[in-house]
Amino acid sequence: MQKGIYLLQDMGVPVGDYGFRWYRHGPYSQELQDDMYYEDGKEGYTLSLSEENAESVNRLYNIIHSSKRENYTMSRWVEALASLHYLHENILSFNANAEDAVAELEKRKPHLDNHEANLSAFELVEGLFR
């Protein structure tokens, strides 16, 4: 949930105004965690999105379900996507490329060790912001 909300928020989808920081498993927001605990067990509600925002959600959904995740579980794939974007936007220098981001990811997260899948993840997730 954290990683998906992070990416949607960065794509401009109005899902809240959460501050994210780096954590063991990538971008994390304590405010979002608090909101999730508060809402846990309550009846859900329907979110109405503009056509543009619905398209953004759809684009992210398609990337999350991409066959390019190779041997990663869904959870690890989303962790790689969100972590790569966070590293590229918040940690690395402005001119960092895919190899730089993937090298940093693999250094910080040795369990995300499929280099080709990580390169694909970087290209896919950064494509959301072009």
Placement of each model-derived feature along the sequence:
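Domain-edge interaction signal
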Residues: M1-R130
